[in-house]
């Protein structure tokens, strides 16, 4: 018999934002997934390779050339989270490309989602669907592909023995690493349809949501796992649906900003968006997170987050069951 979970929400107004936050008693859906990889399409691969390795300080876990012409490098942000840098070929437009969500059982995820109503992808159904499981090459991971209603690609991925990601996880020795891939942002074209997809079909818990001061836009944080989230916003009038930015958690934001400036990143004002810069630190409202933005050579935004005691993300983590 399917268990019904009742949700109780508290509404709080913070700096003009209406924040709706689940009560501490809300139970976790625990869909068996966690954010593990976000893909980056680079305009200048060599420049981006230097940026992520020497400036950001991320370890190159492994590299490969899928077609003998373009290149991919996996950078290890933490023991089990990665950024996948890809050399743009046919489409030179830089940006974030796709999401991997780690699972211990891809077959079970596919079966659960199909039972929930996510249809198999086909020649005539290319969004709001999921593919059959496969062994991805050359990484040797077991994975499937979900395409959400906006065309965003999500790959449930199993780090099976012998896969390149499993080898990278097992060989991780950086005990002092203080960074982790925590949030990926998406912009969707049909907000209610996407809400239905992520809440009812994917089974993600609403960690918290808030509306813009004018009430015209809603941002929803879905909790994928205890410490990883999907941040969903409606696409801007002049924009296209897709991935918007990532959040990287750090234990000491000021120290990380100082290290990045020492590594050569120019300082930027809080609202600056210039490539190869890091902005001043501030507290983002209404999530109450200490943050700064890094813009890579392609203009891709990496939001550095230090979780304060009253941060909404920290509260969501602490209430995860």
Language-model regions: role of each:
Residues 3, 23-31, 33-44, 73-75, 89-177, ...:
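Vicinal oxygen chelate
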Residues 8-19:
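Bacterial N-terminal signal peptides
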Residues 30-33, 39-82, 108, 115, ...:
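Core segments of cupin and vicinal oxygen chelate
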Residues 47, 102-105, 158-160, 165, ...:
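Generic signature of mature, soluble extracytoplasmic domains
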Residues 193, 199-255, 262, 268-270, ...:
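Structured core of small recognition/catalytic domains
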